[in-house]
Amino acid sequence: MLDIQFIREHTDIVKESQRKRGESVELVDEVLSSDTARREALKAFEEARAQQKEIGKKVASAPADEKAKLIAETKELSQKVSEYKSKADSAAEEYTTAMWKLSNIVEPEAPEGGEDDYVVVKKVGQIRDFAAEGFEPKDHLTLGTGVAGIDMRRGVKVGGSRFYFLRGQVARMQIAMLTMAVDQAEEHGFTLAITPTLVRPEVMRGTGFLNSHADEIYRLREPDDQYLVGTSEVALAGMHENEILDLGNGPLRYCGWSSCYRREAGAAGKDTSGIIRVHQFDKVEMFVYAKQEDSYKEHEHLLAMEQEMLAKVEVPYRIIDTAAGDLGSSAARKFDCEAWVPTQGRYRELTSTSNCTEYQARRLNIRERMEDGGTRPVSTLNGTLATTRWLVAIMENHQQKDGSIEIPKAMRAYMGGKEVIEPTKWEA
């Protein structure tokens, strides 16, 4: 949610942000109109109620010949107060509905355009020349099946399309990768949290995911009415809902470990083979509560954390600055790290980190205590540190001619010193 005072004073900035996102500019006028109607209705209600109270005070001491008249006026005003209250409540509801539709204000530095209009910030690492090495690279599913580590057939049998089993050493590789991510986060002062994967509608709505991603989210209907999270960002944002935080000693930094669920509603025909685009996966997510003035510095820190982790798994990658039209409703700025996938001949997203400024905090009523005793909304930020999809890039970039997979050096200590995952015969 945005600050209504900012919208009133900087209407052009908010409209420009909506335009850059490809969203309704007219919505800003709707917000301002409903704000005016809300304030006028509230003023009328408060004036009528004050008048009612004033007359009520006079009734007790009024002479007998005036008392009946005053009582009649009180009853008439009571009816008006009730009507004004109803109008004020209705106006407030319309205002809130309009406000909650507005997306966060895009940072001026974010590129213009849509999904394909990102800007490449930099590329890191050398892409392997498999032709020079004398063999054609196998895709991650072929490799994973060959080492008895990915079982799509039985995953589909159990859960339906886009489900899978991770087995044996590939399952161990995922645990190793996620554990290594947690260790790195803790070294940087993050607190580990294993988070709920079911959340209340108010929390999901508060994070902004029901604005543009509602069709991607699994929902449990009555009598439960809960949502399955697609990232632990949701639970970590909701953890301090309706709280006043002490950020005097610096930001609150969490890393959440959770299973995640996504419907992939708009992904028909995309990445139907393997584990790139699936309904369930595991992820370690960073989440930060920071002072407003520290959010940009914290965003850079999260991106640096992601790069540190990518260096450990030794895959070529690039960083892109996501265009305004491809941002989620909560994000003011977002950077993605995309790893090179040899068999696809292109980069695929492994991480994203977003600065949500005060947008989520306003919606969830999360504030910080100021030195003067007052409060103000905090900034929230998030970033991926490791997830199941990383296995795709690791396996394909570390494959050997015989179908084995070399384990990245930094991960070996997490896999009992094992250096290579060898092909295995099994009934796939």
UniProtKB/Swiss-Prot annotation:
Residues engaged in binding L-serine: 231-233, 285, 384
Pathway: Aminoacyl-tRNA biosynthesis; selenocysteinyl-tRNA(Sec) biosynthesis; L-seryl-tRNA(Sec) from L-serine and tRNA(Sec): step 1/1
GO molecular function: ATP binding; serine-tRNA ligase activity
InterPro entries given in the database record: aa-tRNA-synt_IIb (IPR002314), aa-tRNA-synth_II (IPR006195), aa-tRNA-synth_II/BPL/LPL (IPR045864), Ser-tRNA-ligase_type_1 (IPR002317), Ser-tRNA-synth_1_N (IPR015866), SerRS_1_N_sf (IPR042103), tRNA-bd_arm (IPR010978)
Binding site for ATP: 262-264, 278, 349-352
One Gene Ontology cellular component annotation held by this UniProt entry: cytoplasm
Superkingdom of origin: Bacteria
Top-level class of the enzyme under EC nomenclature: ligase
Segments forming a coiled coil: none
Localization per record: Cytoplasm
Recorded catalytic activity of this chain's protein: tRNA(Ser) + L-serine + ATP = L-seryl-tRNA(Ser) + AMP + diphosphate + H(+); tRNA(Sec) + L-serine + ATP = L-seryl-tRNA(Sec) + AMP + diphosphate + H(+)
UniProt keyword list: Aminoacyl-tRNA synthetase, ATP-binding, Cytoplasm, Ligase, Nucleotide-binding, Protein biosynthesis
Entry's EC annotation: 6.1.1.11
GO biological process: selenocysteine biosynthetic process; seryl-tRNA aminoacylation
Keyword Aminoacyl-tRNA synthetase: yes
Comment text on domains: Consists of two distinct domains, a catalytic core and a N-terminal extension that is involved in tRNA binding.
Protein family (similarity comment): Belongs to the class-II aminoacyl-tRNA synthetase family. Type-1 seryl-tRNA synthetase subfamily.
Role noted for this protein: Catalyzes the attachment of serine to tRNA(Ser). Is also able to aminoacylate tRNA(Sec) with serine, to form the misacylated tRNA L-seryl-tRNA(Sec), which will be further converted into selenocysteinyl-tRNA(Sec).
Identification of the protein by name: Serine--tRNA ligase
